[in-house]
Each structure stands twice: as structure tokens, then as C-alpha cells.
Amino acid sequence: MEKELINNSQSNIYPFHMPGHKRRGSDIGAGLDPYAIDITEIDNFDNLHHAEGIIKEAQAEAAALYGAKRAYFLINGSTCGILAAVSAATKRGDKVLVARNCHKAVYHALYLRQLHPVFIYPEITRTGLQGQITEAQIRAAFDENPDIKAVVITSPTYDGVVSDVAAIASVAHEHGALLIVDEAHGAHFGFGGGFHQNAIALGADAVIVSLHKTLPAFTQTALLLLGGMREAAVEKFLGIYETSSPSYVLMTGIERCIHYVRDNKETAFAQLRSRLDRFYQKVSGLSHLNVVRKSDFSADEAYDFDESKIIIFTKEAMNGHTLLELLLKKYELQLEMAAGNYVLALASVMDTDEGFDRLADALIEIDSQLEKYKSDFEEFYDILKQEGVVHKFYLPVKMDTDIYQKLPAVMEMYDAYDADHQAVYAFKASGKVSGAFINIYPPGIPLVVPGEIMNDKLIDDVIKAVNSGLEVDGLDFDPDANMWKFVAVL
């Protein structure tokens, strides 16, 4: 592992992926040997779970930066903060309004606290991305379920789609419910550069931000920010979900990140915006690839769009996985992820002019090659295979706008998850109660959750996704029969 990590760090591969420090720790003053500062809770170094000294001061600095009532360091990642926030906002058996596109940690919290979810579904955009959650959806859900105790949404999404958090917070508070926002992909919000305001400033009661995703911080470092949620309840559940052996290396990394943003926000985010604008201008004339901008979304699809999420659609030419592989092997650009018809590159304040130029130049060259071979794309792929830069070709797969069905639930999710299960072949699964989550990555929205009844369309959609080269989680494969199996409740 160490050898591979060193090789990667010394290579010419440019990281358009998280973590947001982009392997440039020296640029934020991170020069210490991690072993030299790796300690436990010895005298004068405070205790994360009973912070009274230097950790308390560092957390107060984070709260001040984001405008929060309190901030808690998370060194188990945003997952820990999501579990704590949902648990603190509810009592066992409560009803919770949950955006279906929430992170799996939200579903784990529903399971652990035996909560009853009411799901709302984001619209799928014309291009196949998951869209926003709207104020109207939230209001309609409360009209049907006035006993909802908490609302949980993700904004921005992995792809950068932002919902109207202020309006959603207003509706939730009007009905006496708390609003929890998974803002893991928006830790850079609220600091200028034309990026959206952060959810705490917009009225959310608890907000989880993953510093490591978009800011210069170590992987698995995050913050739980409080607005209107009770501190005592949050601290109780952080004591359960967060490690009792917190890393001072990671906590110091959080503090360093907070100081960097505090001291450089006036220039760093404006510079990032300038670099993004220059990049988008360079690639605006592509014919066979399409780089998305905010103007590509209708008002119904997105309240706002985070342009530090660089989405490159492949149109008719190739699958996202093919483009991802081509960019890595030929151009030494490692992007964040690939989908059926697009790839995603993540930009941060630590990216350089060189990085953006390399990505723009690569896309322009690929687009020109696609134009050259537009009458016979197969010839182009044959050349790429001969060069060893692409090993497999998939056709583009656009996510159907109706793929996320509202399936009937006949069991509580936690009961179905704990029940005895059987693996059934695809052709026998329709009509059975799911015992597992089935997700297509990206975007990772569960097509079915435990307790819901599977139907023919679900099974057809899942098998289609597998055959198209997409990553599908929640299935079993029988190599002897060469068939997929679905997990069903006995």
C-alpha cells in the first residue's frame, strides 16, 4: 500500500478528485512529521468528547467561520455527524421526512433509531442527473404527515445541484420540525467566489460539512455545525458514534484548514472562480462532449448549481467509464467518478492553472478526435485499444427520468433489514419484499430499500444497469448459473 501511494504521489497524474488539498499540503503550511504530533489525551491537550481547552478553542474558531452556534470536529467523516444529528433530532419510532437521494449514513440512522421514513424524490433532470428537492414537495409532505419531526436533505448533491434551503427551513420550522442538511459536498459554500451561501446561514438546524471533500483537509475530516438543534442531545450521540481515540493529526488538520480559509477566503475563492470561468470558456465550443454550466439547468431542476463540480457529458460518443479511463491513461488526469453518460471532476481552491489547462486541452483534443471519426466511432476506439489507453467500450447510458419509483412498503425498513433473507434469481424476484438496499452508483439513490416490494420494472432497470457497466450495489451473483440474485425477505 505504501509503495503504491508513494508512486502515485510522485507521478504526473493530476488529481481532479477529493481530498480537496490536492496533495499540496506544503502550500498550507503542513510540514510536520505526522508521527511527531500523534498523541493521545495527555495533560494540556484536551479531550474531544469533553473539550475545555485547545480543542474547544479550535471548534469555536470553526463555528465563527461558518456562523454556527457550535461546531464539532468529526474525525469519523460526515457519516458520524449524520448519525449523530438524525439521532439527536428524533426519538425511537419518530416519523422523518427524507430525501431519497440522501447518503447511506442517513439510512443507517433510520435503521439504528427505528425511524419511520417518509420519502421525497428529487426530479431527474433532462440530462439524467438528480435534481433539487423543492419547497412545494416539503409542504405537501407535511400536509399528509403533520407528525414529521425532522427533515433530512442533501444540498449540494454529489453533482452540485443545490436546493432552496432557506425556503425548506421555513416550512420545516413552521411545522415544528428540525432541518438537517447534508452539506458534505459544500464545505466551501459561504466564502465568496460566487458560490452559494452555507446552509447554517440559511436557517438549517444542523449541517454536516466534509472539509476533506472541497477544502484542504485530510480524508475523513468534517464538521457538525449547529443552528437550532440542542447541544446536549448532539453531544450524547457523538459520544456513541465518534471514536474515543480521536487522532490529533486529523484534528490538527481540521484546525489548519479552518485557519487557511479564515486567512485566505477573500482571495482563494475568487481565484478559484476565475480559474473555473477560464476553463469553462476554453471548453465552450465542444461538439461531442458537453461541459455543464448553471445555465444548463431549468429553475425546476436546480435552485442553484455548484460549478466547482465539473460535469462532462459524453453525448452519443462513449460511456462515462470509457472517458474516465481515457483521461487517466492517455492524459494522466484522475477524475472523481464516472457514470453512464458523464464524468465528474472536482475542483477546489488548491487546484492550479496547469491542472485546469491540462483538463481543458485533453477534452478539446478528445472532442476533435471524435469529430474526425464521427462517422465511425468504432474505428476511434480500435485505435485507443491498440494504444492501450482503453480496454473496454460501453455505449452511453442516460438515467431514465422514471427509474426511481415509489414502491409500496409493506414492512418497516429496520424489520425487513433484520429479517431472514433468501437470494432469488432475477426472474423470480418480482412481487417479493426486498431485504436489501439496491443502489446504482452514481448517484447512489436506493432504487429499493428493505421492506419495499420489488416489481418487474425495478428488476429490468437493475439488470440493464449491470449490463451497461454501471456499478450496482445490493445484488448477489451466481457464477455457476451466470445470473444475478436479489435479496428478498423470507
Predicted regions and their residues:
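Anaerobic metallocofactor- and corrinoid-dependent redox/one-carbon enzyme cores
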Residues: R24, I254, K432
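Conserved N-terminal alpha-helix of the aminotransferase class I/II PLP-enzyme fold
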Residues: Y35-G77
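N-terminal "arm"/small-domain region of PLP-dependent enzymes with the aminotransferase-like
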Residues: M1-G53, Y441-P443
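Flexible, glycine-rich loop/tail regions that form catalytic "lids" or insertion modules at the edges
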Residues: D43, Q422-A426, D478-L490
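Short glycine-rich or small-residue beta-strand-to-loop segments that form or flank ligand, phosphate
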Residues: F45, Y72-L74, V151-T154, L344-S348
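Conserved PLP-enzyme active-site core in the AAT-like
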Residues: E2-I6, I28-G29, H50, L65-A68, ...
